[in-house]
Amino acid sequence: MEPNSLRTKVPAFLSDLGKATLRGIRKCPRCGTYNGTRGLSCKNKTCGTIFRYGARKQPSVEAVKIITGSDLQVYSVRQRDRGPDYRCFVELGVSETTIQTVDGTIITQLSSGRCYVPSCLKAATQGVVENQCQHIKLAVNCQAEATPLTLKSSVLNAMQASPETKQTIWQLATEPTGPLVQRITKNILVVKCKASQKHSLGYLHTSFVQKISAKSLPERRFFCSCQTLKSHKSNASKDEVAQRCIHFFACICAFASDETLAQEFSDFLNFDSSGLKEIIVPQLGCHSESTVSACESTASKSKKRRKDEVSGAQRNSSPLPQDAVSSNLRKSGLKKPVVASSLKRQACGQLLDEAQVTLSFQDWLASVTERIHQTMHYQFDGKPEPLVFHIPQSFFDALQQRISIGSAKKRLPNSTTAFVRKDALPLGTFSKYTWHITNILQVKQILDTPEMPLEITRSFIQNRDGTYELFKCPKVEVESIAETYGRIEKQPVLRPLELKTFLKVGNTSPDQKEPTPFIIEWIPDILPQSKIGELRIKFEYGHHRNGHVAEYQDHRPALDQPLELAPLTTITFP
């Protein structure tokens, strides 16, 4: 019997099944691989599309505490009777009550709560419900806290939105009432808003949901409690797209400011009909140079199409065709000068490969340490100006890794502030992250390099004119001659007047209450296209005189003092 007949032969009990169907399987919308309907992700390893997350839910999702930045306790609580995506706000507080007794008046504190579900509010005002509602009970037992999401000013500036929208988002982000966007669950977020009659707490819920179907295109749905439910499908009208609320753009900026979130919500960020490609372009590093090189390698039609796609992203700075022309001019202009420059180099006998000229992170860090050494001079007071460095983002990532040494997780900054620079270049809105180091050993661990170890103290000697210069104690190897000539009494070593400076980090005196910090400030994206940020180092140092702490005294000679010249004499020549 032939092998084909074996394949086509069907058992008798399966002969009446009829035509095969696709029941129980579905096609991946990205790669087209067939997967089971119960599968959580695509079995194609190169695709890795996640269809849905596991049904197992954490108990903390029922109630989540919101970060408000004040004593106000606000909770996001799930409404069990409506569904998993319906949530409400609950406010908890403490009220004082006086009780008159025989012994006197007793003041007690009672915990009070207010649920903002319309039915609960109505029942509370009418006095129908005597006990607490189920939402307040969930908030009282809550132990989970929302996850704050960062927002980068560079992403906000690159977003294709009106200036009023950007200004409103930045004003909400810089208010001291907690983060702008906080994540409650996988799909639900809490966004700050302007307090109104509908949202009296100044917060509202938003949700991002994506439904994948084998028969139709993926359906992306965004819902905000400030408006009615809208389904943003691929065939959504332009009017619906244009009517997005400000809270949608705030969430999109938060997604684009984080690599993990940008990958998770990439379907919303890369949604063609929404014009959101401009938002994610600066975050993923798709600069104009890489876009131009990709366009040059394709046909003219694809080149024109790609220019049209990214022209909106470059509208605020410079149009892409100009960038393409300038880059082409640079490339074409580099061909002839290279020959001339190579001839000049050969004539001079100096051949230097520019590609081999590099600066490692440790070499740069050694220069930072050396500059700190130069700043710790005895001749000046112990409060120098901040040291400013402009470095690439990769250098700061390596420095932040040194800051986090010794801890299991990445050390977060002590403070994060946003500011608007109007009186100096570059202009715009920036974020500043500040770390306070109060352990001198940790400072040394951060700045030590094999080429330049950090010197916590520096020795100086005083000159006759009142100035100071660095004193390096010579290292002399002393031979042991006591065995040959017997014991020799050790004479005390004659040392000059001991003048030292020392880094002030932590508590340097017994009566000091607050430790002196070694401050590291980082402002990313000062040069957004080059990915260059600004690093500021602030520190203080003290003065030692013969082992004792001495107050700084300005011994520098005054510039207006007359120079003492020897009297002129008459010289006679024979």
Curated annotation (Swiss-Prot):
Biased segments, Polar residues type: 313-327
InterPro entries: C2orf42, Zf-tcix
Stretches the record annotates as Disordered: 297-327
GO cellular component: nucleoplasm
Designated name of the protein: Uncharacterized protein C2orf42 homolog
